[in-house]
UniProtKB/Swiss-Prot annotation:
Residues 245-320 are annotated as: Alpha C-terminal domain (alpha-CTD). It holds the Pfam family RNA_pol_A_CTD. It is an enzyme of class 2 (transferase). Gene3D superfamilies: 5' to 3' exonuclease, C-terminal subdomain, DNA-directed RNA polymerase, insert domain, RNA polymerase, RBP11-like subunit. The N-terminal domain is essential for RNAP assembly and basal transcription, whereas the C-terminal domain is involved in interaction with transcriptional regulators and with upstream promoter elements. Keywords: DNA-directed RNA polymerase, Nucleotidyltransferase, Transcription, Transferase. Homodimer. The RNAP catalytic core consists of 2 alpha, 1 beta, 1 beta' and 1 omega subunit. When a sigma factor is associated with the core the holoenzyme is formed, which can initiate transcription. SMART domains: RPOLD. This is DNA-directed RNA polymerase subunit alpha. One of its GO terms (cellular component) is cytoplasm.
Length: 320
């Protein structure tokens, strides 16, 4: 092989390391290519793989999300948060409606839903709520297909969704729950300055982790192949540095330009960086003094504009 010829990597190992979790090892890569490919694949896997999620629901006897449900242990907000944990598979449909109706005391799970043809729930044991006594409980939910994260639209007081008691949910469509990568040193013959890319990916069970990587690579290929036909030669870009934490997450919360009320509430909780904020869950933020649902919606909308969301798992983030 000529000294100027780039090495062609190959997949040397695919190992299942847990439920819906796999580790893929790729080598050899030219120095710096491990971080280049790892960063690109990670971003695409988190933001661009198609999936399904519940986007709205109606609960009999409930008019708004701050209600308490008679005979139900959880309040409405907790029920909505539990609905987000349901992993749905809907390959041939864009939108579907699912229903459940129970009357007996005990746990209500995703397996209680009546599903139309073409819709599957892969975690039927997911708990939605608990009935404290024998009473009727009915819930209707809308499932939609999408990509990335979508903040629930805010309905006007006179809108149709408000009159019909529709509860809208923020939707995380990505079937990828966690993606992490690391780069180690590789060797080929006398060369020891090469990269080995190791990717660990966990899905919600609706997609095989290996298939998710293939889909991400296909998306990248389709986006980049347009440059192959360029006639002019572009300037070479510098190799990416070995970044372990996205610089955006290190920026102060003030850069989000939140309202004074929201910003002061976050500072009072020692939430100083964007990374500190996205690691918090909705439930945790709602426990913050003086931070209500309006401020929470503002925070979620601003984060969504930066392709971020609450409850993110950030690798290597320093613990407080």
């Amino acid at each position: 092989m000529a000294l100027t010829e780039l090495l062609t990597p190959r997949i040397v190992q695919i190992k299942e390391i847990g439920s819906n979790t796999s580790r893929v090892t790729l080598e050899p890569l030219e120095r710096g290519f491990g971080y280049t490919l790892g960063t690109a694949l990670r971003r695409v896997l988190l933001s661009s793989i198609e999936g399904a999620a519940i986007t709205e629901c109606q609960i009999d006897g409930v008019s708004h999300e701050y209600s308490a449900i008679e005979g139900v242990k959880e309040d409405v907000i907790d029920v909505l948060l539990n609905l987000k944990n349901i992993a749905l598979l809907m390959p041939d449909l864009e939108r579907a409606e699912i229903r459940l109706s129970v009357t007996e005391k005990g746990a209500i799970t995703a397996g209680d839903f009546e599903l139309p043809a073409g819709v599957e729930i892969v975690n039927p044991d997911c708990v939605i709520a608990h009935l404290t006594r024998d009473i009727p409980f009915s819930l209707t939910a809308v499932v939609e297909k999408g990509r990335g994260y979508r903040v629930a639209p805010q309905a006007d007081d006179n809108s149709e969704s408000t009159r019909s008691n529709v509860l809208r949910l923020d939707a995380s469509f990505s079937p990828v729950r966690r993606i992490a990568y690391r780069v180690e040193q590789a060797r080929v013959e006398q060369r020891t300055d090469l990269d080995k890319l190791i990717i660990e990916i966990e899905s919600n069970g609706t997609i095989d982790p290996e298939q998710a990587i293939r889909d991400a690579a296909t998306i990248l290929h389709n986006q980049i192949k347009v440059f192959v036909d360029l006639e002019s030669t572009e300037e070479e870009t510098e190799e990416e540095e070995e970044i372990y934490i996205d610089p955006v997450l290190l920026r102060p919360v003030d850069d989000l330009e939140l309202t004074v009320r929201s910003a002061n509430c976050l500072k009072a909780e020692n939430i100083n960086n964007i990374g500190d904020l996205v690691r918090r869950t909705e439930v945790e933020l709602l426990k913050t003094p003086n931070l209500g649902k309006k401020s929470l919606n503002e925070i979620k909308e601003v984060l969504a504009a930066h392709n971020l969301e609450l409850g993110m798992d950030i690798e290597n983030w320093p613990q407080n």
